[in-house]
C-alpha cells in the first residue's frame, strides 16, 4: 500500500463508519463461531497484515494477539496494547516471526487482494492453525468494481464468494461460513466505485470521515448486519467474509 493510504487510515480508523461497523461484525463472528466453541478462557490469535492496528483492540478482547505487518511506517504507528505483540511479517514467505507457532484463530482482513500469490498465502497460513482452529478472512468483492480505489490500495484483484470459497477449499480448508457483508449499503458503494472511474487517479470516494450525522447513520445501518451474521448468508455485498476450519 502507498504511504498516503496508511496515513489516511490512521486518521479515520477509529471513527469512520466502515472501520467501526466492520470491526463490530467481525467481533460478532468471533464471539459466536470461535470463542464460544472453545473451553479456553483466552484464544491465541494471529493477524497477518494488521496495517495500522485498527482491528487489534477488538481481537484482544478474545485473547493474546500476535500481529504481523510488512510496512515499517504502519507497524511503527501501532500504539502499545496489553496482550498484543507486533512483528514484521508478510505472506506468503515472511512468517519467520511465528515459525513453529500455531494459533486458535488466524485472521486475514482485506489482505489477500494485496498478495499476488494468493493460493501460496493461504497454504502458508495452514501451517499456523492448531487442530480445530479457525481461519477468518475478508476480501473486497466483485472484479467489476475494481478501479481507482483498488489501485490506490495496491490490490491485485477482487473476489466473488464462489471464487473465494473454492480458493480456500483447494488449499485444504473446510468452509464453515461464507457470505457477504456491507450488503445494506452496497448500492451506494457500487455507485461510489463507478463514480471513481470519472475522477482523477489520485482520489477515491468515501475515504474521508463523513459529517457526524451521516457517519452515525451509515454506522447504524452497517451494524444492523450483526443481527444475521454469521447465521444467514446474504448473496451480495461490498466484502466477502469466510470462516474456515483446518
Give a label for each model feature.
Residues 4, 185-246:
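A C-terminal cap/extension of S-adenosyl-L-methionine-dependent methyltransferases
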Residues 173-183:
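Conserved S-adenosyl-L-methionine
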Residues 1-101, 105-109, 119-122, 210-212, ...:
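Conserved N-terminal segment of class I S-adenosyl-L-methionine
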Residues 74, 143-145, 184:
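Feature marks short, surface-exposed loop/turn motifs that line or immediately flank catalytic pockets
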Residues 110, 114:
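A short His-aromatic
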Residues 60, 79, 116, 130, ...:
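Short conserved AdoMet
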Residues 7-12, 135-157, 161-169:
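Short, glycine-/aromatic-enriched active-site segment of Class I SAM-dependent methyltransferases
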Residues 119-134:
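A short glycine-rich, Lys/Arg-flanked "PGG" loop and its adjoining helix->strand segment in the class I
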